[in-house]
Amino acid sequence: MEAKKSKNRILTLFGSGETSPHMAKNYRHIIDGLSHDLQKNLLLDTPFGFQENNMILSKKIQDYFASKINLKLKSLKLTSEESYSNEHTALLSNADFIFSGPGSPTYASKIWLKHNLGDVLKNKLKSGVVMAFASAAALTLGRYVIPVYEIYKVGDLQGLNEGLNVLDFLGKDTVIVPHFNNQEGGDHDTSHCFIGKKRFNNLIDGLDVITIGIDEHTSLTFDLDKSIMNVKGLGNVYFISREGEILLKNGDSMDIKNINSNYIPKLVEKKEDLVIENDPVIDYVNIDIESLLEIRSVARNSKMYEISDKIRDLLIKYGIEIEDKESITSWKKLD
């Protein structure tokens, strides 16, 4: 009789771009390395459950996973306090894959905490699950939650809210900050998930916490079986505490044990200080031009011009010229 395969224990946090076409490879990278099939897959839709168009948003997310990742997600339909039933807990407890994303972190965390879903998610990470939490949902998994809407839209500086503390495996209180490098404000600071660096520092003043800052269009994956975390995407991930800062870039990985109960961070200035997983040396390149142009467009819209220019230079290097006309980018092979 064939032994039952144990389920992988993986948690991925997205800074943004969780349903962008160019981020599909981040999901595939995880799924391709699994030891078990993903059969019971859920969309935890609470963060945007208060929105009138929540069913439309659910459908868009389900369509993305079906077409880009080849995963069918069942919407949990836990959109409000009144909608909760014990079946929701049962479904989460038996899930193979759980995705949750945009919306209000405080709206979601209040409902999840009331029904002990934080403990359910912790137990799932112990027994085996792939969790992908992005934006608002990612915010809820720390010891504390930033009340983003309340601060950014209303100006209510009420302080941090209680989080689910799913990242307690790090052995330290955490605050997760997606959209860490946001620049949409233009003439005012919208980094640190739209509230700005100054307001964020005021929120954590006096707290002994690790701030996990995840740049936009960037993912941080914790593989609890291998005790490894790695970063993929356009930006960086920052682990910041009173003692210092650790910076992980695209392609970097590090042992989770370096940021646990004996947390003694050092400011990482040299890439060689990190444990890097490098691909084998290859002597040819197969470029997906349209995907690169899409990433470049995202970088330009986010004012990440250095990345945009590097993509242009890379394409030129391999004989591809690109031309920007208003909102349209075209390309052609160089003679």
Predicted regions and their residues:
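Structural preference for alpha-helix termini/caps and helix-kink/transition segments
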Residues: 269-335
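Glycine/threonine-rich flexible loop motifs
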Residues: 105-115, 186-187
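C-terminal and late-domain segments of enzyme folds
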Residues: 2-37, 48, 52, 56-59, ...
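Catalytic-core regions built around general acid/base machinery
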Residues: 33, 91, 116-128
